[in-house]
């Protein structure tokens, strides 16, 4: 009887241990606002979570089993979802678990989500579009609370209360090649006005751009544009911008329509340069309504832009980056930080000016001719018509184990 009792107790302990081993750890609670655990927050907002894979090559990765998050200030959009999907797919190949959180253009929600993930035990955070007026001080505080956490940032300038540019040790910053966007688009307008350029005349441009200090990407785009102004290759007919930022596209349509009435179309304006595609959409609508023949170009791209270019009218080109590549790049940088391989990040070919400053994702031009070369072109299949620079990944940071796990 005693032997039977002992046997039954032993079996009970085995089943109890098996049950414990198969359970899941409780998820961390949000730091404030009652938004729940990071995973719950993602599910509630329609965001996606990629579970870490088991087996396979993940055991060879020094970041296998790590938990990372992509936290975007803005609401979800096609290009940001492309980024998220690529970030998560790359994380999975490296053996990590990745979550995505979109923050509805709300800075307080963005900061709360960063704090929640940091408090919740995430190993790495890829944070995007934080405001220059708060990002440096806020993220510095997060790392003081969680010194083992790794952070990489996209389109998130660091400035102190005096407006001075700052750095945070161990945090890799990267941006799009904004000045490059501007340069390549001006070059497109120069090509469209070759006779004038050959004659040594300045090309007359209606510039769609906000004033200095509006935001960091626009300021960096102005740097590239200004080079052509200073060289006398272009001259501004006028600079215009929307008067209502909350309804930027419709406001830009109205502003452009009023501006066009002051000029004699192509006799006075050789081209329109737009710093942002949401503005460009309004410009294009105004040009169509006025039956204008003035060509235009714009930074950024979305499916609506592609549809407008495919109409074969005024919209001649967009400057963009490959958002699928952007997501992979972001995950690579964060993984290398977590692996302590900052030397591999520094070996990348896309640092701006000096190692340790910030990295810039290379830009590419998508032309009207490319978009019209086949039917059904979207941002999701843009690689089918864009030139080789769109799919080039030679500029990405890598190392031996990444080459093995990611293929390059």
Predicted regions and their residues:
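Extracytoplasmic "Venus flytrap"
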Residues: 55-86, 90, 99-112, 122, ...
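Hydrophobic alpha-helical segments within soluble ligand-binding/sensing domains
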Residues: 55, 62, 110, 172-203, ...
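Short, solvent-exposed amphipathic alpha-helices that sit
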Residues: 79-96, 181-185, 216-236, 251, ...
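Hydrophobic alpha-helical
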Residues: 119, 124-146, 224, 241-308, ...
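Flexible loop/hinge segments that line or gate small-molecule binding clefts
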Residues: 140-180, 200, 204, 303-311, ...
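Hinge/cleft segment of the Venus flytrap/periplasmic-binding protein
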Residues: 50-60, 64-66, 202-212, 329-408
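Short beta-strand elements in bilobed, periplasmic/extracellular small-molecule ligand-binding domains
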Residues: 92-104, 204-207, 229-249
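Short, low-complexity disordered leader/linker segments with a strong preference
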Residues: 1-67, 92, 119, 141-148, ...
């Amino acid at each position: 009887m005693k032997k039977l009792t002992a046997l039954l107790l032993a079996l009970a302990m085995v089943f109890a241990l098996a049950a414990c081993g198969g359970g899941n750890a409780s998820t961390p609670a949000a730091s404030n606002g009652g938004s729940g655990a990071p995973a719950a927050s993602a599910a509630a907002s329609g965001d996606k979570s990629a579970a870490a894979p088991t087996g396979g090559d993940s055991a060879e990765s020094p970041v296998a089993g790590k938990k990372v998050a992509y936290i975007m200030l803005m609401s979800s959009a096609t290009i940001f979802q492309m980024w998220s999907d690529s970030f998560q797919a790359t994380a999975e190949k490296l053996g990590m678990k990745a979550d995505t959180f979109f923050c509805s253009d709300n800075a307080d929600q963005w900061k709360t989500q960063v704090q929640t993930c940091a408090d919740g035990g995430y190993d790495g955070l890829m944070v995007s579009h934080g405001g220059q007026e708060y990002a440096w001080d806020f993220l510095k505080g997060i790392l003081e609370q969680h010194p083992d956490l790794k952070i990489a940032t996209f389109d998130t300038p660091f400035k102190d209360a005096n407006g001075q540019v700052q750095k945070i040790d161990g945090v890799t910053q990267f941006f799009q090649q904004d000045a490059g966007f501007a340069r390549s688009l001006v070059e497109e307008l120069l090509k469209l006005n070759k006779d004038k350029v050959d004659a040594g005349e300045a090309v007359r441009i209606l510039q769609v751009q906000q004033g200095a200090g509006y935001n960091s990407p626009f300021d960096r785009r102005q740097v590239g544009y200004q080079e052509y102004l200073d060289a006398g290759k272009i001259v501004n007919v006028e600079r215009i911008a929307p008067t209502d930022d909350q309804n930027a596209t419709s406001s830009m349509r109205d502003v452009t329509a009023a501006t066009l009435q002051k000029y004699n179309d192509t006799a006075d304006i050789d081209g329109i340069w737009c710093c942002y595609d949401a503005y460009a959409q309004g410009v294009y609508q105004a040009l169509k309504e006025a039956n204008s023949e003035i060509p235009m170009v714009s930074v950024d791209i979305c499916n609506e832009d592609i549809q407008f270019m495919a109409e074969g009218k005024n919209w001649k080109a967009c400057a963009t980056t490959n958002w699928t590549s952007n997501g992979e790049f972001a995950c690579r940088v964060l993984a290398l930080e977590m692996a302590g391989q900052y030397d591999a990040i520094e070996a990348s070919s896309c640092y701006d000016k000096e190692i340790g400053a910030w990295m810039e994702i290379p830009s590419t031009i998508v032309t009207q001719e490319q978009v019209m070369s086949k039917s059904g072109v979207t941002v999701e299949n843009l690689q089918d018509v864009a030139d080789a620079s769109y799919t080039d990944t030679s500029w990405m940071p890598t190392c031996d184990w990444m080459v093995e796990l990611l293929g390059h």
